Amino acid sequence: MEFRKVFDTIPEQFDKYRPRYSEKLFAELVSYADIKPGKKVLELGPGTGQATEPILNTGCDYYAIELGGNLADMMKRKYGKFANFDIVNADFIIHDFGDQRFDMIYSAATIQWIPEDIAFQKTFDLLNPGGVLAMLLTKADYKTPNEELYNKIQQVYSAYFKPDIEYKQGSFVYSNAVNYGYVDFEKREYHGKREFTTDE
């Protein structure tokens, strides 16, 4: 199986456990990119929509491209009632967008699965002049200051966490966007908290 499609085999679990994004992030993104009715937005690989509804709620013309058929179907079930929602089940790398152009293209932990040169050049070419590329990423690498506890947790991971499919990701350097015509590259961080039950 192609690794890029692994989450398509477990859409319900992906939807349940995938981290959500900060409300402040979306408020600032919508303001920065001036997203509102009449603006055209493309989301790359929305999965099950963890970063979709806040953008849909702006009234913009929302368009998504999702590689996974099961994930695309879930997106249609969740957001098909929105008049401004549209999604295509296709591979961004080879998809022909025709004369479509966008005011913002965004990716919530997806763009890094696309070869860097294709990701940056194709998104740049699809943007209207002055358009925005937003790349969202979640990181769950908080390290407790309790070193003894941290080391014990790592021992448990080493002993029991053996995924069926090894996690492989090519090198993707977000700041390299400036090598493809992008300007005003900046990084912002938003912190949150996730809680799980012992069963989870």
Describe the residue ranges of each PLM region:
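Class I SAM-dependent methyltransferase SAM/SAH-binding core
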Residues: 42, 48-95
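Nucleotide donor/acceptor-binding cores
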Residues: 38-39, 100
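Short catalytic micro-motifs in class I SAM-dependent methyltransferases
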Residues: 109-110
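A short, conserved alpha-helix within the catalytic core of class I
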Residues: 113-123
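Conserved catalytic/acceptor-binding region of the Class I
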Residues: 124, 129-194
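A short acidic, Gly/Pro-enriched loop at the edge of an enzyme's catalytic core
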Residues: 94-105
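Conserved class I S-adenosyl-L-methionine
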Residues: 1-36
